[in-house]
């Protein structure tokens, strides 16, 4: 299922970029955009995880640098039947964490300095088990590619606005789609980016919560961690967070009103906590 979702995401990106090329440069623009999209798809597959980690200034750590945290991840990886992922720390006081990579053999988990400070060892174990569940369930590729694609589409939308304003007088079919086509694509592009992010199903968070609770063996530890993170992340939002990558994190790093909640890629926190608390009163299989 995740392979199908990844293919659909890449196809959507290709079609959108071809449409953008047509709006700006007609048939020649379509051809150029098609080859550019193909190159971006290959680049996203191989390098999107590195881009996301660099975007947040994540620093890879060794066991010697942080034996407690590194050892915790290694122990949980063994319990989950996974290869040892690379471990990163993000220099941010806002408490959060995410997983990224192509597959279990090329995976990384990252946690902020803030989450390492405010959670108890048991709560942190629940959070990292959740992130390793994304690796085990192979959510990480589609999540990371979605982040790269959404960011690229938003950037192209901004470029199209300027192109439509300063170069949109042409209306020849061969040379360009004109100002109206460029403006239309500038409006469509950010909406498409939002829809791509929403395509990364909310249900994967529920599954990662459940799988993570089974890996660490303590649903209440993860429930308590989510409750604490939900409160702390609102009081101390991640200033460097970007909408294109918000869906990667265990809790939404963005702050906003009802509209943000409506289009959030994360399920309601109270529902996630309730499901975990219900798990605590039945045998874990």
Swiss-Prot record:
Localization, UniProt: Cell inner membrane
Keywords: Cell inner membrane, Cell membrane, Hydrolase, Membrane, Metal-binding, Metalloprotease, Protease, Transmembrane, Transmembrane helix, Zinc
Keyword Electron transport: no
Ranges that cross the membrane: 6-26, 28-48, 140-160, 176-196
GO molecular function terms attached to this record: metalloendopeptidase activity; zinc ion binding
Gene3D superfamilies named among the record's database cross-references: Metalloproteases ('zincins'), catalytic domain (3.30.2010.10)
Family designation: Belongs to the peptidase M48B family.
The protein's name in its UniProt record: Protease HtpX homolog
């Amino acid at each position: 299922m995740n392979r199908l979702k990844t293919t659909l995401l890449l196809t959507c990106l290709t079609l959108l970029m071809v449409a953008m090329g047509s709006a700006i440069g007609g048939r020649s623009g379509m051809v150029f955009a098609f080859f550019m999209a193909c190159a971006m798809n290959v680049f996203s597959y191989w390098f999107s995880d590195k881009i996301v980690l660099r975007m947040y200034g994540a620093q890879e750590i060794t066991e010697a640098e942080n034996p407690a945290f590194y050892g915790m991840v290694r122990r949980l990886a063994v319990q989950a039947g996974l290869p040892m992922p690379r471990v990163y720390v993000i220099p941010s006081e806002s408490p959060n964490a995410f997983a990224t990579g192509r597959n279990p053999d090329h995976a990384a988990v990252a946690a902020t300095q803030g989450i390492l400070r405010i959670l108890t060892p048991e709560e942190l174990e629940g959070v990292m088990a959740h992130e390793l569940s994304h690796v085990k369930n192979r959510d990480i590729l589609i999540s990371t590619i979605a982040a790269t694609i959404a960011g690229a589409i938003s950037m192209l939308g901004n470029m199209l606005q300027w192109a439509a304003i300063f170069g949109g007088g042409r209306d020849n079919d061969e040379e360009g789609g004109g100002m109206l086509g460029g403006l239309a694509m500038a409006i469509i592009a950010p909406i498409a980016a939002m829809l791509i992010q929403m395509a990364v199903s909310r249900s994967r968070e529920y599954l990662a919560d459940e799988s993570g609770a089974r890996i660490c063996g303590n649903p209440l530890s993860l429930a308590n961690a989510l409750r604490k993170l939900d409160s702390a992340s609102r009081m101390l939002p991640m200033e460097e967070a970007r909408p294109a990558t918000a869906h990667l994190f265990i809790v939404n790093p963005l702050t906003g009103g009802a509209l943000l909640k409506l289009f959030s890629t994360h399920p309601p926190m109270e529902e996630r906590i309730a499901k975990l608390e219900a798990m605590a009163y039945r045998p874990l299989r």
